[in-house]
Amino acid sequence: AAKKRPWKCCDQAVCTRSIPPICRCMDQVFECPSTCKACGPSVGDPSRRVCQDQYV
């Protein structure tokens, strides 16, 4: 079973091949969730935000 993601919406997760995998959510949103510790601008669209936190 997949691990629970720390955010309500994370449709575009990118994970490393390490064991355990380290993942980041690449969803572009207008506002990061309150559980996000490091919210930054999207590279593709600076008006949107991407949570840069990683999770296992």
From Swiss-Prot:
InterPro entries: Bowman-Birk_prot_inh, Prot_inh_BBI
Recorded superkingdom: Eukaryota
UniProt GO cellular component terms: extracellular region
Cross-referenced Gene3D superfamilies: Cysteine Protease (Bromelain) Inhibitor, subunit H
GO molecular function, one term: serine-type endopeptidase inhibitor activity
Residues carrying the site annotation Reactive bond: R17, S18, V43, G44
Xref: SUPFAM superfamilies: Bowman-Birk inhibitor, BBI
Keywords: Disulfide bond, Protease inhibitor, Serine protease inhibitor
Disulfide bonds: C10-C25, C15-C23, C32-C39, C36-C51
Entry-linked Pfam families: Bowman-Birk_leg
SMART domains according to UniProt: BowB (SM00269)
Family under the similarity heading: Belongs to the Bowman-Birk serine protease inhibitor family.
Name of the protein in question: Bowman-Birk type proteinase inhibitor I-2B
Organism the protein comes from: Triticum aestivum
Lineage start: Eukaryota, Viridiplantae, Streptophyta, Embryophyta, Tracheophyta
